[in-house]
Amino acid sequence: MSTKFEKLEKLARESFQSPEVPETLPLIHLRNGMIIFPQTVVPVHVAREKTLLALEQSIESYQQFVFVTSQKDPSVEEPSFDQLYEIGTVSKVLQVVQLPDGSFRVLLEGLERARAYEVVQDNPFLVKLEILKVNYRKTKKLEALIRSVRESFAKYAYYTQRYSQETLSAMSEISDANRLADFVASLLPLQLKQRQSLLEQLKPAKRLEMILEILSHENEILEIERELDTKVKKRIEENQKEFFLREKLKAITEELGEKDTEADQLKARLQKLKLPEHAKQKATLEIERLEKMSPYSAEATVIRTYLDWLFNLPWDNSTEDRQDISQAEKILQASHYGLKEAKERILEFLAVRKRSNSVKAPILCFVGPPGVGKTSLARAVSQALNRKFAHMSLGGLRDEAEIKGHRRTYVGAMPGRILQLIRTAQSKNPVLLLDEIDKMAVSFQGDPAAALLEVLDPEQNKEFVDHYLEIPFDLSNVLFITTANVTHTIPPALLDRMEIIELEGYTDYEKSIIARQYIIPKLMGENALNEATFKITQGAIKKIIHTYTREAGVRQLTRMLQRLMRKSALKIEQGAKSVVIKSKDLEHFLGPQPVQNDIMLSKPEIGAVHGLAWTEYGGVVMVVESLLMPGKGDLILTGRLGEVMRESARIALSVARSFCGQDCKEKFQQSDIHINLPEGAVPKDGPSAGITMTVAMISSVLGKPVRNDTAMTGEITLRGKILAVGGVKEKILAAHRHGIKRILLPKTNEKDLKRIPPQVKDKMEFIFVEDIEKAVEKSCS
């Protein structure tokens, strides 16, 4: 074989005068994106057996002529003719050199374009060719293209610094458009498809346009890269001085023996902390970033703040829950009167937790009017459980970043309030109070209620991710307690995640006990009074409850008692030995009675009925007035009524007309009925006044007075049926505060009497009605 190739090499070195290109030539197919253009000399590496046979045949039988084309897919080892480009270049073998690895380097000179249209032989390929002649006329446009290509290539060569001055000189001497296009195309680092397109383009002008477009695109990118390099170089030069000084300072520090850098101190601190693995990895990454940057840069300050938060969160700190359930019960009883359901739920949690540490903390929601002890009960729960306590008010909150924090890309970014409270408590299992959860707002900054879904979901909060921290923090051990006045303003998805515990309003009896056992001892301590210097009679306490306060809770009662003690302390400082507060002294100490029963009916009246309503502040008693006057049968409604109450009034009118029958037909047709609910500045809505408005209308039409010791509540249907309503306990307590003795309730609300305290229930008469007939019978005297 070596003798054969020595002969091949010898033949290639011999001078050769080509007559004409033969019609049939051996075919050499190149890969790896190589294409030979006419009038160019290209070295080619040859190793495949089939290619070597074609080369040998070219030298021996075809005067060193060979047809060179490219593979469409370079990965194919032995392509078929269909996998080759038809158009290629007729080339001449100038030199063959054998390499140490047994392959050959062949020097080929491209002569002219040709198209292979028929295969004569397969191994090696022998093909018939059609020579593709290039004919063109010189025009001004062609001359302009030649100049543009020269200038663009010179600019490209300047940017890339790839080409020698000899190459540029050779290009400038080429005046033939066809040759210039092929010369420049052979020098550019193009993709295979781009090279093949240029080879197949027979019009020099079109080929120059394609090359000019490629050069313009490359020059634009190179110019941008050059600008960026200039900016980077300038920035590096500006930072060189600072870098040099920093390195010098570092060397001086090492010489002085001060080897503990900031990064070393942080790493040592990290080793002492009991962080979970993912938190350690994050901290290590941030310390490494800090180590590589200037200690005076803004980014370094951001990283220090982040690491400070990461290190100071209580990843492993927790308090041990109280195991003595009886002791926990004593703490709850000592702090609050009543509230049986809430206390039982906390003790149940303690009992289960004592038996199994894997139990998840409940998500509790205390719902009730203001002043009933929702917030203070949450504090008592933390004491009973022996846990840390943290508090956050959600009222008016409208930015979800307050819950989940800001991302560190923002200036002044901080974690959300949840993690801030956890850090303040320094415990991963505190009692966390989210106050006023029913008063959150929605804005363009997001929905905080949606952000709370992850916080209050026991299935998700084990891996709560704050936007600032960017790594999970376990909230599953936190006992979340939320408070609300009403539930209808809480989003359903959020409400579904919480266990609702209703804290209803107190009776006057309960308020007097709370005042005597809880409020007065606490306030006496705050005002430095004792039993020898300050006394208040039971009658005075009851009078304050009846005439100076009218509320579901005890907040206003506390203010009144606080005011009494301040004035008593002043009298003692002015010389009095002690102060005893009696009922008759209240007006002197507290001023005129602010609570009057002006709205209450003093005697039975026609068209005036006591109604019961329920608001977020507790139950209220209101008077529904009905007036019959000459008109055309219209219904007039005043008192700032909502749409539901207006519809209920229209139903009440229809029921009243049906109840009164044909005898009153003309009266309804020739009269207008005016329904009014006093206190017109207060908005009112809901269906529970249906029975009240119906009875008031019937009373005014029939001329029957309604008993003034009676109040009622219930929704009316078009068939005159009375449906159940909510807030029954609050409504009954409100009626009791106003001295009402008889209550008309829907029959289906009879079960709610079980929740009424005996001291209230025993003093009132409850009448359960199913339809309007019985309601009129029991209320009209």
Swiss-Prot record:
The reaction(s) annotated as catalysed by this protein in its Swiss-Prot or TrEMBL entry are: Hydrolysis of proteins in presence of ATP
List its EC numbers.
3.4.21.53
Please state where this protein is localized.
Cytoplasm
Q: What upregulates it?
A: By heat shock.
Q: What is its main location?
A: cytoplasm
Q: Which domain of life is it from?
A: Bacteria
Q: Which residues cross the membrane?
A: none
Per UniProt, subunit arrangement is: Homohexamer. Organized in a ring with a central cavity.
Protein name according to UniProt: Lon protease
Q: Which organism is it from?
A: Pseudothermotoga lettingae (strain ATCC BAA-301 / DSM 14385 / NBRC 107922 / TMO)
Gene that specifies this protein: lon
